[in-house]
């Protein structure tokens, strides 16, 4: 069931648009495709997480606590320099070899195990265990090049898994020559009235003072458009059909049109409006190729939808030395997320090293009981537990009131 459509009859037009605007920035998906299961599971995890976890101080920073509603966790600089480069150096120091600018083409399968993997360059890779941890759109193509593999249990799920296509989530940056201040720390924004479901964050709020924003740049906003099928007001075109210049003009128009955003800017900048701050440059992430025939990205992004949830494969496959990993595989996290990706990696590692421990997702006892009851109702074809329980409570109160009234009359 589509989450947005399930809530539409219950909300006003303004409340509905505000509610679904949270789906892109928070859940990381297009609100037109988000299932009720995915939305419910995501927000439940945000509200009902375990008690706060204390992180000890180390050479990277002071001690801090992570818990429900802690806010966005952010790096203190650009992702490559402050995260990926450090991990790359660490893995190389441990003996990991990377083959850059190479693509996996197919697996060699002898009917019992994987005997090797061939790259598009022709290079053959041999290993005791092969872990397929790439996005499922490419994985589906790779597996289909070896029909004997593609028809096996779990591996045969990939074509159905990607049936809804990728989620188009376009990243962009807006640079200003003057510093734009915000009324509170770590002010992250969802532009709820934007057709493209825009979300924004000003990086200078958290980046270290010695990190360069760019020559002559005092404020650097990073943003994302999360919905690709809703037409913008300026050109009447959705993201999927815009040219790059049209996309940029739509972004500017939607931001300048947002009264709530402008009110925040005026509050923190002595009454100055957003329009008075000159934009020096707007840059769209280089991997996106715009075309009237449809936008395409080099790394198609998979997310849960109303059609794909049940097709998620397990990490284990019928081939003993082929393991799957990624947020598109089945996990206890149960929704496409960084947490699911990490968990899938632990589960894949445990298949190689059985002593690896996979931490279960936290679910309170009352929620587990409620979920089991709802599963029972589903098997019976009965309404959702949130419909049945309130109805049962009302009926129970009526019965109790009737019994009390009858007892009073007899007395």
Predicted regions and their residues:
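C-terminal segments that line or cap access tunnels to active or ligand-binding sites in enzymes
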Residues: 54-75, 127-129, 134-343
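Amphipathic alpha-helical segments that form well-ordered structural scaffolds
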Residues: 6, 82-93, 246-258, 344-351
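Active-site/ligand-binding neighborhood in enzyme catalytic cores
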Residues: 1-110
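Short, hydrophobic alpha-helical segments
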Residues: 94, 126-131, 349-357
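Acidic/histidine-rich catalytic neighborhood
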Residues: 123, 138-140, 160-161, 378-385
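Rossmann-like nucleotide/phosphate-binding core characteristic of flavoprotein oxidoreductases
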Residues: 1-26, 249, 253-278, 294, ...
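C-terminal lid/capping helical subdomain adjacent to the catalytic/cofactor pocket in oxidative enzymes
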Residues: 301-411
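Conserved beta-strand-loop-beta-strand element in the redox core of flavoprotein oxidoreductases
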Residues: 107-125
């Amino acid at each position: 069931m589509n989450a947005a459509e399930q809530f539409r009859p219950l909300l006003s037009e303004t409340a509905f648009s505000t509610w679904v605007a949270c789906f892109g920035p928070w859940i990381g998906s297009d609100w037109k495709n988000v299932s009720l299961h995915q939305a419910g599971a995501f927000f439940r995890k945000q509200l009902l997480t375990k008690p706060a976890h204390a992180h000890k101080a180390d050479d990277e920073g002071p001690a801090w606590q992570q818990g429900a509603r802690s806010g966005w966790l952010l790096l203190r600089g650009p992702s490559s320099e402050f995260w990926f480069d450090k991990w790359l150096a660490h893995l190389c120091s441990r003996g990991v070899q990377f083959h850059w600018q190479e693509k996996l083409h197919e697996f060699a399968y002898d009917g019992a195990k994987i005997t090797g993997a061939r790259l598009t360059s022709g290079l053959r890779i041999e290993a005791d265990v092969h872990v397929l941890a790439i996005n499922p759109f490419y994985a589906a193509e790779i597996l289909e090049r070896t029909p004997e593999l593609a028809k096996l249990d779990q591996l045969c799920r990939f074509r159905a898994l990607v049936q809804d296509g990728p989620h188009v989530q376009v990243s962009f940056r807006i640079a200003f020559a003057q510093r734009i201040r915000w009324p509170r720390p770590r002010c992250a924004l969802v532009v709820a009235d934007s057709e493209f479901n825009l979300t924004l964050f000003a990086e200078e709020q958290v980046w270290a003072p010695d990190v360069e924003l760019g020559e002559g740049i005092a404020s650097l906003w990073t943003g994302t458009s999360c919905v690709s099928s809703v037409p913008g007001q300026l050109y009447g075109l959705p993201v999927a059909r815009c040219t790059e210049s049209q996309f940029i003009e739509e972004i500017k128009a939607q931001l300048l049109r947002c009264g709530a955003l402008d009110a925040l800017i005026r509050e923190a900048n002595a009454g100055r409006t957003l329009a008075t701050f000159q934009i020096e440059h707007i840059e769209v992430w280089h991997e996106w190729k715009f075309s009237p025939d449809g936008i395409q990205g080099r790394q198609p992004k998979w997310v849960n939808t109303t059609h794909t949830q049940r097709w998620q494969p397990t990490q284990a496959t019928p081939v003993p030395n082929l393991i799957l990993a990624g947020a598109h595989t089945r996990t206890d996290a149960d929704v496409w997320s960084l947490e699911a990706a990490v968990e899938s990696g632990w589960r894949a590692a445990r298949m190689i090293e059985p002593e690896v421990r996979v931490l279960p997702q936290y679910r309170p006892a009352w929620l587990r009981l409620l979920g089991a009851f709802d599963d029972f109702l589903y098997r019976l074809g009965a309404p959702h537990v949130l419909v049945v329980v309130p109805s049962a409570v009302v009926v129970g109160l009526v019965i109790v009131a009737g019994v009390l009234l009858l007892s009073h009359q007899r007395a």
